Amino acid sequence: MSTAIWILLIVLALIGGLFGGVFIARKQIEKEIGEHPRLTPEAIREMMSQMGQKPSEAKIQQTYRNIVKQSKAAAAKGK
C-alpha cells in the first residue's frame, strides 16, 4: 500500500476515535449526573438561608424533588 493510503487510514482512525471518545464520555457524564445530582438538600437549605428564608424540612424536600424531576425530564427530552 502506498504511503498516502496509510496516512489516510491513520487520520480516519484518529477522527473516529475522537468522536467515539467524546460520545462515550458524554454518556457517562449524563449517567453520573442523573444518578447523583450536584444539588443536594443541604445545598438548597444553605441557599435558602443565604436568601434570608428559614425553610421547613418539607419545603426543602419539595424543592429538591422538583429539581430532580425537572432534571430527569430535561434528560429524557434530550435523548
From Swiss-Prot:
HAMAP family: UPF0154. One of its GO terms (cellular component) is plasma membrane. Belongs to the UPF0154 family. This is UPF0154 protein SUB0399. It is a single-pass membrane protein. Keywords: Cell membrane, Membrane, Transmembrane, Transmembrane helix. The keyword Membrane applies. The keyword tRNA processing does not apply. The chain crosses the membrane at residues 4-24. It is found in: Cell membrane.
